[in-house]
């Protein structure tokens, strides 16, 4: 079976911290002094202007705080007694209020795109953002196809799209220690300025009549029969027909829904943006240069990615990340960051004392098999990372949500216009997607299991074989996969190619994955085939019939057709 890796999309939400500096001082970083180094960077930043979503905090203390959350997550020290009830359902009708919004979007950093799309269609929309509604300094890396989704839904013009691109580069490398090296073009090859992008969308949102409430967090949501009432932490009350939760993995509503659940998978990532790279015209989508590594009392496989940064021709962002389960003896972010200082220079072919550290980045991304998250309450829907729509390999953020903006904006308009805002109808907007669910086996194959002791080179060999076969099969197989799209025919071709060319490697794969995960993957793979047939053979004949149905039935069938399309990967258009 084919066990693959998708490049981590470099636009994480909520659990990321970055530290900024505009100092010209060169830092010689060692693991013993990283506390002092990071605090110097914060001090040099002069004021630490925070941005919503990724990059909200900025100190060594923030790293320790995030590590404490990671410790609690893998130790399961939380209890049901300590659960904070943010969202509650009330049976009685609310009192009439003067102003009722069609939608209140909680979490503006990524929520502003959907909010703007709805406002442009005539909906009365408000955005609630705990901090200031502005983008971070660090670029988001996406493909042009993904970015054009914002033009498709009217959020950006063609000219504005070009203006928000901070840097463009080609080609990109995929490579594994001692094995295959593949070069591709036009995949995650744009660095988009979140500052410009969010400022542009915010201006268009306000121009369409939208309301922005900054510096206010969500304290409570009470759902009544005819509306939802949002209480903000400054005492402000908003009444809305629909609440969109775009607050990412750290959403308090998501924490309530998933309370007591241990994540099925976690990605830990550390990195920097630094100045001083002479050869800086290409990127790495995913790269390894070491076998399985002992980190503390646990073993893990380190992966790398790197991109030119838009802040200068010699500026480069490098990330080191790993996939883990959430068991107690897994390494901390601080341990990984110490390894990063040692491993990044030979990876990039530089000396640490020759580069200027501009930003330090680190993040924690938990994912769950029960995703996308179905609506748990009437009038509340999780969107983006909050819903778990991201792949457990690519880990979401900006590029993950753009793929679904067209589907979500049209679906939400249908729901609002037909007043289909109960949890059963809203759940149709976060449907089962077999191509997403099947990726869990890939995540397992790329992480070192505690109860299995594979060869230190197993993961590198596995990925090398997969990409070697994909390269031979050509663009129709490798390009969709590298853009976070799983399709049945390319996957079937790859499976056959591996079985024919590397039959002796199959038993090792089965040992690494395990019988039950393999059985689970088989179920999703069969569903992927079924969804492909339904979309290609059945859906075209249903389109005119669906349009003849009453609005309520149209809503249900449109969501079903979208589930077949997106669940089979046929939303991908090259």
Indicate where each model-derived feature is located.
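Extreme N-terminal leader/targeting segments of oxidoreductases
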Residues: 5, 9-102, 121, 561-574
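N-terminal Rossmann-fold NAD(P) dinucleotide-binding loop
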Residues: 111-112
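N-terminal FAD cofactor-binding segment of flavoenzymes
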Residues: 132-173
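Short beta-strand to alpha-helix junction loop
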Residues: 140-141, 182-204, 252, 269, ...
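Predominantly flavin-linked oxidoreductase catalytic cores and closely associated redox partners
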Residues: 207-346, 405
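FAD/FMN-dependent oxidoreductases across multiple families
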Residues: 310-312, 325-444
């Amino acid at each position: 079976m084919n066990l693959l890796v998708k490049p981590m999309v470099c636009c994480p939400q909520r659990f990321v911290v970055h530290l900024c500096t505009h100092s010209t001082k060169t830092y010689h970083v060692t693991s013993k002094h990283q506390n002092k180094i990071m605090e110097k960077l914060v001090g040099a930043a002069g004021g630490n202007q925070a941005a919503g979503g990724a990059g909200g905090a900025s100190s060594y203390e923030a790293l320790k705080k995030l590590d404490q959350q990671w410790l609690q997550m893998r130790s399961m020290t939380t209890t049901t007694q300590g659960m904070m009830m943010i969202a509650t359902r009330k049976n009685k009708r609310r009192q009439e209020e003067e102003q009722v919004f069609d939608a209140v979007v909680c979490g503006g950093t990524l929520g502003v795109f959907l909010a703007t799309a709805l406002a442009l269609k005539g909906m009365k929309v408000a955005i609630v953002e705990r901090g200031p509604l502005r983008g971070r300094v660090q670029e988001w890396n996406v493909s042009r196809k993904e970015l054009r989704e914002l033009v498709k839904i009217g959020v950006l013009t063609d000219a504005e799209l070009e203006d928000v691109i901070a840097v463009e580069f080609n080609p990109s490398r995929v490579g594994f220690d001692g094995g295959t090296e593949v070069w591709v073009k036009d995949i995650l090859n744009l660095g988009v300025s979140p500052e410009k992008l969010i400022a542009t969308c915010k201006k268009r949102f306000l121009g369409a009549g939208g309301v922005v409430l900054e510096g206010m967090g969500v304290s409570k949501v009470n759902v009544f029969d005819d509306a939802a009432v949002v209480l903000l932490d400054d005492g402000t009350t908003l009444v809305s027909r629909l609440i969109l939760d775009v607050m990412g993995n750290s959403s308090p509503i998501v924490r309530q829904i998933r309370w007591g659940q241990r994540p099925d998978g976690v990605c830990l990532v550390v990195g920097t943006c630094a100045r001083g790279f002479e050869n800086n015209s290409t990127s790495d989508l995913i790269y390894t240069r070491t076998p399985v590594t002992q980190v503390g009392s646990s073993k893990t496989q380190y992966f790398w990615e790197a991109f030119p940064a838009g802040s200068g021709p010699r500026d480069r962002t490098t990330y080191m990340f790993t996939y883990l389960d959430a068991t107690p003896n897994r390494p901390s972010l601080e341990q990984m960051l110490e390894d990063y200082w040692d491993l990044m220079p030979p990876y990039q072919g530089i000396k640490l004392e020759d580069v200027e550290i501009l930003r330090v980045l680190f993040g924690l991304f938990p994912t769950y098999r029960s995703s996308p998250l179905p609506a748990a309450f009437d009038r509340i829907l999780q969107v983006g990372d909050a819903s778990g729509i991201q792949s457990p390999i690519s880990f979401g953020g900006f590029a993950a949500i753009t793929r679904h903006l067209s589907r979500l904006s049209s679906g939400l308009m249908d729901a609002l216009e037909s007043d289909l805002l109960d949890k059963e109808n809203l759940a149709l907007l976060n449907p089962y997607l077999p191509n997403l669910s099947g990726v869990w086996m890939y995540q397992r194959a790329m992480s070192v299991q505690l109860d299995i002791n594979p060869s230190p080179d197993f993961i590198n060999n596995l990925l090398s074989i997969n990409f070697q076969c994909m390269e031979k099969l050509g663009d129709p197989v490798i390009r969709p996969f590298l853009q976070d799209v799983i399709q049945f025919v390319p996957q079937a071709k790859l499976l056959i190619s591996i079985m024919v060319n590397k039959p002796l490697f199959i038993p090792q794969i089965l040992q690494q994955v395990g019988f039950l995960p393999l059985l689970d993957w088989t179920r999703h793979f069969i569903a992927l085939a079924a969804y492909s047939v339904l979309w290609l053979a059945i859906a075209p004949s249903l389109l005119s019939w669906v349009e003849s149905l009453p609005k309520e039935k149209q809503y249900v069938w449109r969501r079903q057709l979208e589930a077949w399309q997106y669940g089979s990967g046929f939303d991908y258009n090259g």
